[in-house]
């Protein structure tokens, strides 16, 4: 967590001639007492192709910093014209306002700056040599680009890093054996459960085979009660037929006897 938070920046003296000082009203909040000062710095980017032309316009140490909301005005000198390439004087560039604590940068604010001539005639027909006296700057204060960095503050540096306690007496091999034994017990239990399921499955299959062999009544004798009843009915029908045949033969014998007696007469 950042101990210092940037709340607001008001760009003063804008637009202004190229040679006028830069002015910023900065508001920030400090959450805890600080041992060191805050260093504010303004940098002018002289070229878009090389860092060699960057100029540090000014720096300011603010401190001691009280806890709470603080406000101050930061003023910086304009850049040196001779250190800027002629082709980069009248163009769009960037200024960077940054703040550091104990040589550690924790916030950076960038602004686009448009440098142009102050008259329409010079803008349409720029002279071969740049007339700096007629150049005005316009900082795009409504569109800043803010970048924040995490740094170590006073309280964080004193606490240091905490690590879990070492355990030199810990025996990893014993732990592995215990874990392995637990796994073996689980495997044995799974095998026993598997055998029980297999036995139950065999019993079900045996019952199915018994039914297929004809023991539909489930009494274990391998016979079906329905089949027994059907057999009794068939036997009655056979007896009736045999009786009818016997009666027919008796009638035939009586008729033959009568015929024999008639012939004797």
UniProtKB/Swiss-Prot annotation:
Residues 155-265 are annotated as: Disordered. SUPFAM superfamilies: ASF1-like. It comes from the Eukaryota. It comes from Yarrowia lipolytica (strain CLIB 122 / E 150) (Yeast). It is found in: Nucleus. PANTHER family: ANTI-SILENCING PROTEIN 1 (PTHR12040), HISTONE CHAPERONE ASF1 (PTHR12040:SF0). Histone chaperone that facilitates histone deposition and histone exchange and removal during nucleosome assembly and disassembly. Residues 155-197, 204-257 have a biased composition (Acidic residues). GO terms for molecular function: acetyltransferase activator activity; histone binding. This is Histone chaperone ASF1. Interacts with histone H3 and histone H4. Belongs to the ASF1 family. Its main location: nucleus.
């Amino acid at each position: 967590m950042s101990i210092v938070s940037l709340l607001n920046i008001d760009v003063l003296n804008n637009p202004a001639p190229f040679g006028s000082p830069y002015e910023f009203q900065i508001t920030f909040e400090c959450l805890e007492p600080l041992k060191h000062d805050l260093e504010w710095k303004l940098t002018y980017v002289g070229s878009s192709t090389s860092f060699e032309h960057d100029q540090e316009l000014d720096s300011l140490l603010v401190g001691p910093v009280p806890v709470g909301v603080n406000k101050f005005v930061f003023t910086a000198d304009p850049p040196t014209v001779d250190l800027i390439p002629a082709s980069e004087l009248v163009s769009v560039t960037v200024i960077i306002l940054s703040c550091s604590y104990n040589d550690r940068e924790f916030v950076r604010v960038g602004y686009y700056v448009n440098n142009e001539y102050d008259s329409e005639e010079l803008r349409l027909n720029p002279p071969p040599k740049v007339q700096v006296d007629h150049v005005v700057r316009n900082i795009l204060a409504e569109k800043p680009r803010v970048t924040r960095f995490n740094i170590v503050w006073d309280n964080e540096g004193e606490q240091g890093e905490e690590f879990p306690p070492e355990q030199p007496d810990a025996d990893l091999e014993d732990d592995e054996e215990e874990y392995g034994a637990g796994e073996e017990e689980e495997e044995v239990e799974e095998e026993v459960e598997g055998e029980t399921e297999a036995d139950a499955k065999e019993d079900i299959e045996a019952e199915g085979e018994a039914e297929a062999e004809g023991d539909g009544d489930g009494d274990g004798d391998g016979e079906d009660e329905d089949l027994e009843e059907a057999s009794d009915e068939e036997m009655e029908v056979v007896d009736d037929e045999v009786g009818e045949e016997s009666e027919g033969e008796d009638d035939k014998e009586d008729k033959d006897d009568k015929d024999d007696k008639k012939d004797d007469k």
